[in-house]
Amino acid sequence: MERGMNHRILYPFADFGDTVAILPANETQRKGLDTPVDDRDGDDSLVTYFELARVMERASRRFSGLLRAELTKLGVEDIGPAQAMVLLAIGEAELSVGELLDRGHYVGSNISYYLKQLADGDYIDRIASQRDKRSARIRLSEKGRQLCAGLRQAAKGYERALSHGDQDRRNLETAFQTLHRLELVWGNAARYGI
């Protein structure tokens, strides 16, 4: 890996041992490697699914910390990052609890707790269903909309810092698509096996 980023700078505490660098096809030909990169055994890959899952978990924790810091900057002390993500999942929609569960892939007991906190803090409005008085629809209150707007504004700053052109935006889109595909595959594997 003569060109490109130094992985020791990006991952200073990682031990890559004897890992194989995955090079683009034109790099493979220049280096004289006989085996195409895509045909190599899965054990030789630079990243395993477990390593990817660990990075995703760390990124999730870092994002949660960042979200907590943004909530503090906005003067919000009564809810945490998980509840803020529920507000963002609701967005401009009016949803039933079941629809919110599907949209955010939440656990039922967690969402009930989050919704109670959000209702107690006046971040959401609960509207009783006309057809079934036992069920309710949920939407953001004005306070919830203002908080979401503040969080979206803060997110734009991070997006500008991360995106320096079309290639960065395409890379972000590719990363999103890949992570979404992994979510679907892993979810189906957990439910139905492979």
UniProtKB/Swiss-Prot annotation:
The keyword Transcription regulation applies. SMART domains: HTH_MARR. It holds the Pfam family MarR_2. It comes from the Bacteria. Changing residue 147 to V: In strain: EFB1. Changing residue 92 to D: In strain: EFB1. Changing residue 44 to N: In strain: EFB1. One of its GO terms (biological process) is response to stress. Keywords: Activator, DNA-binding, Plasmid, Transcription, Transcription regulation. Changing residue 153 to E: In strain: EFB1. The keyword Transcription applies. GO terms for molecular function: DNA binding; DNA-binding transcription factor activity. Residues 49-184 form the HTH marR-type domain. Transcriptional activator of genes for galactoglucan synthesis (exopolysaccharide II or EPS II). PANTHER family: TRANSCRIPTIONAL REGULATOR, MARR FAMILY (PTHR33164), TRANSCRIPTIONAL REGULATORY PROTEIN (PTHR33164:SF102). This is Exopolysaccharide II synthesis transcriptional activator ExpG. The lineage of its organism: Bacteria, Pseudomonadati, Pseudomonadota, Alphaproteobacteria, Hyphomicrobiales.
